[in-house]
């Protein structure tokens, strides 16, 4: 550039333009795969039996849960003691809450 403003003659192109592929080749998951991911896991009814923390009598209840959640309940029950309704009534343990 010799003058104050650049002219087209002053600009020298050394590289040639190349075509660019603008096509996106990303693949979206099919509708079958999406349905499998969105389906909730199956819940089953489980019977839970434990001994009363006071008298040792059997305490039973049922829950509806997934298998993974049942494992969490099992670990929790290791640190808790369930109490039967008879012991709650006779020992007046109904504190509410």
Curated annotation (Swiss-Prot):
One of its GO terms (biological process) is symbiont-mediated suppression of host innate immune response. The gene is E7. A motif (Nuclear export signal) lies at residues 70-78. A motif (LXCXE motif) lies at residues 22-26. InterPro entries: Papilloma_E7. One of its GO terms (molecular function) is DNA binding. This is Protein E7. A zinc finger (unnamed) spans 52-87. Plays a role in viral genome replication by driving entry of quiescent cells into the cell cycle. Stimulation of progression from G1 to S phase allows the virus to efficiently use the cellular DNA replicating machinery to achieve viral genome replication. E7 protein has both transforming and trans-activating activities. Induces the disassembly of the E2F1 transcription factor from RB1, with subsequent transcriptional activation of E2F1-regulated S-phase genes. Interferes with host histone deacetylation mediated by HDAC1 and HDAC2, leading to transcription activation. Its main location: host cell. Highly phosphorylated. The E7 terminal domain is an intrinsically disordered domain, whose flexibility and conformational transitions confer target adaptability to the oncoprotein. It allows adaptation to a variety of protein targets and exposes the PEST degradation sequence that regulates its turnover in the cell. It comes from Canine oral papillomavirus (strain Y62) (COPV). It is found in: Host cytoplasm; Host nucleus. The keyword GTP-binding does not apply. The keyword Coiled coil does not apply.
């Amino acid at each position: 550039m010799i003058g104050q403003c650049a002219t087209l003659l002053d600009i020298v192109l050394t590289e040639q333009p190349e075509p660019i592929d603008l096509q996106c080749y990303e693949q979206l998951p099919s509708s079958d795969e999406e349905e499998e991911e969105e389906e909730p896991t199956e819940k089953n009814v489980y019977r839970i039996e434990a001994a009363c923390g006071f008298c040792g009598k059997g305490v039973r209840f049922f829950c509806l849960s997934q298998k993974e959640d049942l494992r969490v309940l099992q670990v929790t029950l290791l640190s808790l003691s369930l109490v039967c309704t008879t012991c709650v009534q006779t020992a007046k343990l109904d504190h509410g809450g």
